[in-house]
Amino acid sequence: MSNQFVRGVCVIAILTNLFSCTQVHWSKTFQKSPLAKQSSGLVIQELNTGKIVFSHQADQFFMPASNAKLATFLMAHSFLGDSIPSFASLEKKDTLFFWGTGDPTQLNPSFKNKSLIDYLSKSTKVLVYCAPQKEIPPLGSGWSWDDYNDSYSAEISPLPLYGNLVGFSVKNQQWETVPHYFKSAILGIHSFNYVLRDRLKNEFTLPVSRSEFKVQQVPFVTSASLTAKLLADTLKKEVVIQRNAMDPLAKIQYVGLLDSLYVPMLHNSDNMIAEHLLLLIGAKNQWTGGAQEIIAKLKKESNYEFLKAARWVDGSGLSRYNLFRPMDFIEILSALHQQFGMDKLQFLLPQTGKTGTLKSIKLKSDDHVIWAKSGSFSNTYDLSGFFQNSKGKIYVFSIMTNLANHSVSESKRDVIDFLENLD
């Protein structure tokens, strides 16, 4: 037996032993963690080598909450390119037909995009807003019905305006609304300290006290009729409604970069942007329907394996019907890393102690960094992203916890504490 063969066998034995020791170490670490005492699944993988450091129930399904936005992010970048398809238009004789694409930035105070208004205001032709032939569901399947008054539950529409939110504020002891159109929809006052909308229609009651009120964003009930009225109110000219599918000859106008949508979606977990990214994908590919139909198309058109197994219902993760596996998010994150590179992902994803939903998280070691997307419901906390240890080594991970009978903040601390063992 040659010395070279013996040395080879010894190297394999040493590596096998080291791997076995690593698995034993992580198994013991996990068993000591509160994560072992609740419904949880996780994968930790070395970014550069692809080696699995530790996994537990990685092939089981969990509610992803806002981690679903990572799937939306990947699909948007794969199907949309770099720019936002803002609206579509077609001129015929004395008529200008226009279609919404789902662009969430039109007249949105956070973006100040007036491209559609500027375009329509220059025209002397009859303005016709072409609404979809089939209504797009304004709320996602499996959304909590009593969130309707909260800004994170803005409705979904083919041509969103003002972020599909009414802004209420007090100036010189007078109530103000943005857009001004909704000033006439204020019906009275109540004893609560917040603005309350009727569940089914655009009627708002206001708090009796104005002195301590600051600003509140409330979703409004969307419709094709209201879209036309809001445009007409801004343009000061009539807007006619027709229900027509987008004409193949219609030209899509591009305004702004998609990065301007990705950052608030990922940093602030903006649900409205996430939902409308799916509509943007549909509009660019001339797919009709809402989230369900577009996701069904993505499952057929995409080469990503995770789509075939996952129960993916909406773009934002608000739905309790979504079901993903930790291993799905490893695949998503790996694909994002391949497409963007680590430097760009460090900008786009929230960072512990610095940006977005992870800004308030203080890690035990100043040398540790996490760039990740969090997601939470009552009894649910998920975190998927990248962890850098004190040696500069980067891991890709997904930790999903469901059905915990304690606060979300406690689950968050359990997840972070477990990750910080990666040194």
Task: Please annotate each region the language model reported.
Residues 79-94, 342-346:
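Short, well-structured active-site flanking segments
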Residues 188-348:
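A small/polar active-site loop signature that marks catalytic segments
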Residues 92-169, 178, 185, 191-194, ...:
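Mid-domain, small-residue-enriched loop/turn segments at the edges of structured enzyme/sensor domains
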Residues 1-29:
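Bacterial Sec-dependent N-terminal signal peptides
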Residues 21-61, 80-83, 119-124:
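Beta-lactamase-like hydrolase cores
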Residues 53-55, 278-423:
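Small-residue-rich helix-loop
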Residues 49, 83, 94-95, 234, ...:
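Coil residues (strongly favoring Ser/Thr
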